[in-house]
Design a protein with these regions (language model features):
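Active-site neighborhood of glycoside hydrolase catalytic domains
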Residues: 151-195
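N-terminal beta1-alpha1-beta2 module of alpha/beta enzyme domains
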Residues: 20, 28-29, 33-41, 45, ...
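Short, surface-exposed loop/turn segments at secondary-structure junctions
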Residues: 28-31, 78, 109-113, 172-176
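Extended glycan-interaction surfaces of carbohydrate-active proteins
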Residues: 2-34, 57-87, 116, 121-148, ...
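Extracytoplasmic catalytic/substrate-binding loops of multi-pass membrane glycan-assembly enzymes
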Residues: 91
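Well-ordered alpha-helical scaffold segments within catalytic/enzyme domains
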Residues: 1-3, 41-53, 94-111, 156-173, ...
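Short hydrophobic/aromatic segments of transmembrane alpha-helices and their interfaces
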Residues: 38, 94, 118-120
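Alpha-helical positions within canonical tetratricopeptide repeat
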Residues: 54-55, 111-114, 118, 176-177, ...
């Protein structure tokens, strides 16, 4: 029996992403289903963990070829066509995290150079949505800014800004605007939390709002440990995984995998390994793929989906735990000031 610390344990997840990926490089949730840019990138990151450099590059080239003039992407595509006119800031920013992750693993700058103009346009779009308070509005639709911000989305953007700044430095470009944006965003996330969820019910009931500031490096050290410990009993079901929403009896594999990364980031590797081990029971024995989630009150998988982004999240969590690649510390380091990490 293959152990979970052996990469072959995850080969079916890698192969699944490859099967779903279209010839144009796009990676939808499932075969012939919708695509969103964030999850497309998450799946592409799973590909590069598995050493699929050509296929991962193809996924980034799809982004290059489908970028809007303002630097953004639409939030949803079906069969290559936009299915929504909304443009979400964290979806657009995530290209930076994906590209930096790719660089850490491939050890060359070719894709960074090829994609730099795409990245630059994307980051300009993102920081154009930043308010004077430091938060970044969550979306734009029909040229109108949707005036509210998300803790999870802004935490993800914070990590993407860190990765983008690192790319700019590696390639010799000025990144002062991005660094200022990152500093303002962090200050807002830490000190001005009333800027978030102003126009809707608080998202604190979602586990992502709990662990994302830790996973993405906004909150560190003892404060990060206290944050995770403080709501652990609310979100984590022993022997099962992490709930998506605090009041729902539903553990989800992607959120649980991200929580694994957050635990590794705060030095709780044994706890991360225990949590990760619980997740493998949620694979379909027919094809060895992970379901989206499990409703334990009904003892049913729901929804009846096996998304590529769940496969990608599992691959990233496995890498953070077992260090299969040189990208395993992607979420464990603050890269902006680490010139020593440049790979010649």
């Amino acid at each position: 029996m293959i152990k979970s610390d052996n990469f072959n344990f995850y080969k079916d997840s890698l192969d699944y992403i490859l099967r779903v990926q279209s010839l144009d490089g796009s990676i939808s949730w499932e075969q012939n289903k919708k695509l969103d840019p964030w999850d497309h990138i998450e799946a592409a990151m799973g590909l590069i963990v598995g050493g699929k450099e050509h296929e991962a590059r193809s996924a980034f080239i799809w982004l290059k070829e489908n970028q809007e003039e303002d630097g953004s992407w639409f939030s949803e595509y079906i069969n290559g066509m936009p299915a929504s006119l909304r443009k979400e800031s964290n979806f657009t920013a995530y290209i930076a995290t994906g590209l930096w992750h790719n660089y850490l693993i491939t050890k060359n700058k070719s894709l960074l150079k090829e994609m730099f103009s795409t990245l630059d346009s994307a980051m300009k779009f993102v920081i154009s949505l930043q308010t004077s308070f430091g938060d970044i509005n969550w979306a734009k639709e029909k040229n109108e800014i949707l005036d509210d911000s998300l803790i999870t989305g802004c935490s993800s953007i914070y990590k993407s800004l860190d990765c983008a700044i690192s790319i700019y430095k590696i390639l010799g470009y000025e990144s002062k605007d991005l660094a200022e944006s990152k500093g303002l965003l962090k200050a807002c996330l830490l000190q001005n939390t009333e800027r978030f969820d102003r126009g809707w019910k608080s998202k604190e009931r979602y586990s992502m709002d709990w662990y994302y500031p830790v996973m993405c490096g906004v909150i560190k050290g003892n404060e990060a440990k206290e944050r995770i410990q403080g709501r652990w009993h609310e979100f984590v079901i022993q022997g099962m995984g992490c709930k998506c929403v605090v009041e729902e009896p539903w553990v989800t594999i992607a959120e649980s995998s991200e929580l694994v990364v957050a635990l590794v980031a705060i030095g709780e590797k044994d706890k991360a390994k225990e949590l990760f081990d619980w997740l493998h029971q949620w694979k379909d024995p027919q094809d060895n793929l992970y379901w989206t989630g499990y409703v334990y009150s009904d003892q049913k998988y729901w929804p009846v989906e096996k998304p590529t982004w769940t496969a990608g999240a599992v691959l990233l969590a496995a890498d953070s735990l077992f260090e299969f690649t040189s990208g395993s510390k992607l979420f464990l380091e603050e890269w902006e000031d680490m010139d020593r990490y440049e790979i010649k």
